[in-house]
Amino acid sequence: MLSCIFQDTIFLSSFLAVSLICMTTALWGTILLVERQPLLSESLSHACYPGLLIGALLSYKVPAFSDSLWVIIFFGCLASVLGCLGISFLEKKLAMHKDSALCLVLVSFFGVGVILVSYVKDCCPLLYNKINAYLYGQAATLGYTEAKLALIIFCLSAVVLWWWYRQISVAIFDREFAYSCGLRTRTAELVVLVFISLVIVSGVRSVGILLISAMFVAPPLSARQLSDRLSTILILSSIFGGICGALGCYFSVAFTCQTVVEGKPISIILPTGPLVVFFAGVLVFLCLIFSWKTGWITRYFRRKWFLFSRDEEHLLKIFWYLREQNTYQVGMRDFVRSRKYQEYFGDKVFPRFRMFLLCKKGLVSCSEHQWSLTDKGLARAAKLVRAHRLWESYLVSQLDFNKNEVHHFAEEMEHVLTDELDSTLSQMLQDPDYDPHQREIPKRTRKSDGC
């Protein structure tokens, strides 16, 4: 079945066109996402609607422009650029909030488009059926001309992003620095605007005005979960966009079938545009869940591991506090009844498994049911207690906390004290010997002892 589908020239042209369009929208969508303007694609896609209709009317009415794709693209891009200029005017001249300006331009231009559609419906019924493809998408009507156009736009987009990469990246992350370096960021911004408008206009027939903004957002959002580098995000985003477009096209054809309802044959056709967006949404969901950097599962296990490590460190601190009371070896019952154990673990039973792990790590030893710290465990516990008491000293001396209110904060912060931060705090506090409660602060060891 797969080979039969790809031998169909009509399917192959629409397949290539949609895949290339989705790859291009993903490229420029990455720029919008990093600039924190993902809704701009939604506004510009609706703003181009009246321009597309005017271009379609001219190509239908004027013999010189008969069935000219370039006329439609030109007026669509013009309307989209005007929409962007309108947003900028509302923001800068009328001090309108960004979101309000986006919404106003969206509804205003789209309203004009709806008025034009009502006119077209009465005077040009044949054209009316054709322009519905702009609103909802109709990938099956995309031929090799559209596929070639999509390929040209994709190649131009890749070249422009490569050529203007430095200007665009600097303008995104530090506009003032770009101005001070003399980089032509204004030209780069204009190029980005023109290409976004061109991509929207050339792609509305594949996904539709109502859904094309999803392809500007979903693939970059998926790629952002996997990398922090702009260049990597651009590449991954383009790949994801192409995959979503290809899957949407294939499944819209593969799952088309006929059935019989009340004796009448009915064709069940899955539209390409919604399927493309559906797969893009599934991809975002999978990346949000399974991303190895920021995915929900990764964060869940990272948090569980932190809590597990924190409890191990609390056990070591309990041994330290017992040593301060001259108890160097302790049995299970006395350990559980100690004040610090009750503070950290409440009424929980003796943690045999955690103690077993601490023994395996060489931090705790057990002899005749008596537990004690090893030299390695003592160094680890000293580092934790030092971190706790340094943080208490910092909060009291530098941030004017009451000394009776800092214990809880220090309990949370002691687990994230690095060697560099330890040195910084020691210098800032002039290497104190005692904390605000007049308890001795353990001295820093030269070697972290596996900490």
From Swiss-Prot:
Record-given protein name: Probable metal transport system membrane protein CT_069
A Pfam family of this chain: Fe_dep_repr_C
Chain segments carrying region Disordered: 432-451
Transmembrane annotation, as ranges: 14-34, 38-58, 70-90, 100-120, 145-165, 192-212, 233-253, 269-289
Compositional bias of kind Basic and acidic residues: 434-451
Keywords: Cell inner membrane, Cell membrane, Membrane, Transmembrane, Transmembrane helix, Transport
The family this protein is said to belong to: Belongs to the ABC-3 integral membrane protein family.
Disulfide bonding pattern of the chain: none
Membrane topology: Multi-pass membrane protein
Organism: Chlamydia trachomatis serovar D (strain ATCC VR-885 / DSM 19411 / UW-3/Cx)
Stated role: Part of an ATP-driven transport system CT_067/CT_068/CT_069/CT_070 for a metal.
